[in-house]
Design a protein with these regions (language model features):
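Short, acidic/polar linear motifs in exposed loop/turn regions
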Residues: 190-192
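Surface-exposed beta-strand/loop patches in extracellular or lumenal glycoproteins
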Residues: 199-205
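Surface-exposed acidic/polar loop and edge beta-strand patches at domain peripheries
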Residues: 1-182, 194, 205-242, 257-340
């Protein structure tokens, strides 16, 4: 049964107390109206217990914002949620529309640093987060008498003439009274030849989850700093500090130990506020994990990023013989749970 305001309620008890379920929780759809954001569609989801998040069909069904009782879970950048028409796929152009948010998807043909591969140029993190969705549907319904489901689903396609034809369907779901959400992806190669498939969930936690009073808790059995800068503070990868102008980003590659159910749970906990956020995902789907730690003023964010391949360029992955391929007609699924603690 849904738990609202500290009490469990049956379906009938809730029906008697409101004219429609939207009074308690549900989805509102609207478009942003100004500047680079004009025309961006948002599905604003409320679960009824203070947990709220925004899914953007215009931006790969990614999660542009999330909060709990008015406290943000994620970092939002200065770019805003730019309309995908402004996407610049060359070099670092991806950053001009990187709004942060609770989830930005990287892939699907490439991710990591810009590169050249077989005469093709691939920009930073590829175009997944800039793919607009079609067949967008909203579900708000009871599953029996015990669970009221709230979900948004849409389908994106990464394709071109003489190129890949990949269909990607995403469902973002929660339930009335919940303090977490579930992202489920189904990716199908509808072409007739194999194609690369790399996917990384760029989950961007921000203030007040991220603060000088926060710690990162994760089942990391090995931490490999990306470079010399990260190596200088590798011993304190799990501690955060106050934001300061000019601090460089630090990235760490973790080897995670899944639990008895094959799941990995990572979380950030603000010890002073006794408030935080978590992610949980199947290790078999995402055997690689990157931590993006930046305490630069204005870019105060800690990214927790599971992926299906090492985080490096497509060209490097190919050279390492580590580039995942999706065969013609093959389907692959990925999922993650994100929520409040």
């Amino acid at each position: 049964m849904p738990t609202l305001y500290g009490q469990e309620y049956t379906k009938e008890e809730l029906r008697r107390r409101c004219g429609q379920m939207g009074q308690l929780g549900g989805v509102s759809r609207y478009e942003l109206q100004e500047g680079f954001e004009k025309g961006v569609e948002i599905c604003d989801v409320r679960t009824g217990n203070g947990f709220r998040f925004c899914v953007s069909p215009s931006r790969g069904m990614d999660i542009t914002f999330a909060e709990h009782n008015g406290r943000p879970l994620c970092w939002n950048s200065s770019t805003g949620v730019r309309h995908p028409a402004y996407y610049n796929e060359t070099n670092l152009g991806w950053l001009h529309g990187f709004y942060g948010g609770l989830l930005t998807t990287c892939g699907l043909q490439s991710y990591g640093a810009p590169c050249e591969d077989d005469g093709e140029s691939y920009g930073l993190h590829d175009r997944a987060s800039y793919l607009p969705a079609t067949h967008v549907t909203v579900t708000e319904e009871w599953n029996g008498d015990d669970e009221y489901e709230i979900a948004v689903e849409g389908t994106m396609r990464q394709t071109r003439v003489f190129g890949p034809n990949v269909r990607w369907t995403r469902r973002v779901s929660t339930t009335l009274g919940a303090s977490s959400l579930r992202v489920q992806d189904r990716i199908v190669n509808e072409g007739f030849t194999s194609t690369p498939l790399v996917i990384l969930y760029h989950c961007n936690f921000g203030f007040p989850v991220v603060s000088e009073n926060s710690i990162i808790r994760a089942p990391s059995v090995h931490c490999d700093p990306r470079d010399d800068i990260a190596a200088q503070s590798a011993a304190t990868w799990d501690r955060l500090e106050e934001p300061q102008p000019g601090l460089p980003e630090r990235c760490y590659f973790h080897t995670m130990q899944p639990d008895e159910n094959g799941l990995v749970r990572a979380e950030i906990w603000n010890e002073k506020l006794e408030f935080g956020a978590f992610m949980r995902y199947p290790f078999a789907q995402f055997p690689y994990f990157t931590q993006w730690k930046t305490c630069d003023a204005g870019t105060y964010v800690n990214g927790l990023e599971p992926s299906n391949a090492p985080l490096t360029s497509r060209a490097d992955l190919k050279e390492m013989n580590a580039l995942p391929m999706l065969e013609a007609g093959e389907e692959r699924s990925f999922e993650v749970e994100l929520g409040v603690i």
